[in-house]
Amino acid sequence: MNQSLRFDKKDRDLLVKINEVIDSGNVSSAEQETFRTSLHPHGIQNMVSTHEERMAMAEVNLLQRLNDGTGVEARLSALKTLHEEVLYSAQTPFRFNTSRVLIQLMKEIVRARGNEEEQLRLIHDFQKVAAGNPRIVRAFLSKFFLLEMPEEWNQKTMDDHVHDANTMGRKNSTYLVMDARVKGIRRLTVVYYNFVDSKVVYELYEAAHIMGISVRLGIKFKARFHDRYVEFLWTPKGFTDTKSVLDFLKEPETEALMQEGRAVEDWAREEVLQTLEAFNAKHAAEISKEWGIEVPLLSEKEFDDYVGMGQTTLIRLSEFVHSQLLPLVEAEAEKVKQELLCASAEDQGVLQERLKKLDELTSVVLY
């Protein structure tokens, strides 16, 4: 009864549709038709679905494609649909800031899967914000620690050193650009190590064009200088569009440089894999002895699956090892907590120290 009073049927119907997409990873064929980029948000789509519903489904559709390994064109198409829905169909002069809050709210809705009460609350907030009332939007900007940006989108905001999933980051290029828009960043420099793939550059620049963000390409190299390694960042300039960047990467001199960079990355990958072998041969037993957990041998294939399209680095290796050990550590910690319930005062001190020791086994320690 209480839930019925707090959330209306529209909230619950939208929750069902969103969770169907989250669980299946796909939007129904009928709903997919409303995401066709050839259809204007103010056109025939208004006859088959509401503005709020289309925005919600466009956002969850994109978020699912960002994480399911979908191809570049599918991600870019989903991003374009989202951009058109939250910007061009908005009946408010506060549309840029409204779109930023709506995207953040949908991310929270997806994260809250499994907690129906929290999802319904967020969906109710989503539908309130979708109306574009400046007072409500400003309240949610503050809640999510987002600065209000001018609706002319002419602010001087930048981030001159970020990484996507192809290097040290966790987000593919489309996701990175979408998050930059939410944060109000207008200029972005995305850094890669030693080389960059033309497919990655295509996605990055096309996504930036869709979202109205100025993006620059940076490639970090290492070189020897006075018997030491120094790092320097190369940021080529003078590009007018995606095609001009891709043409530059196809130039013989640039291709030769990229091939050398690939060779460096291949060498670095082999070094990391040798470290994985050393972990299995030596360090796993040491961790088992020190922390009292049975550490399994880790396979190269599992590590490759964990890294995905990202860079094979020692930091990624330490994070992978930690992800494999975490369930074992949690199980051991739960066992110690149960022992604490019936332990003597003297034993409780020992068990508390054991819990503290288990809590110290982080990816930073492993690194």
Question: Where are the regions a protein language model picked out?
Answer:
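Aromatic- and acidic-residue-enriched segments that line the glycan-binding/catalytic groove
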Residues: 228-238, 315-322
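An N-terminally biased module of ancient metal coordination in phosphate/nucleic-acid-related enzymes
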Residues: 1-229, 236-242, 249, 350-367
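Non-catalytic, alpha-helical, charged scaffold/linker segments
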Residues: 27, 244-367
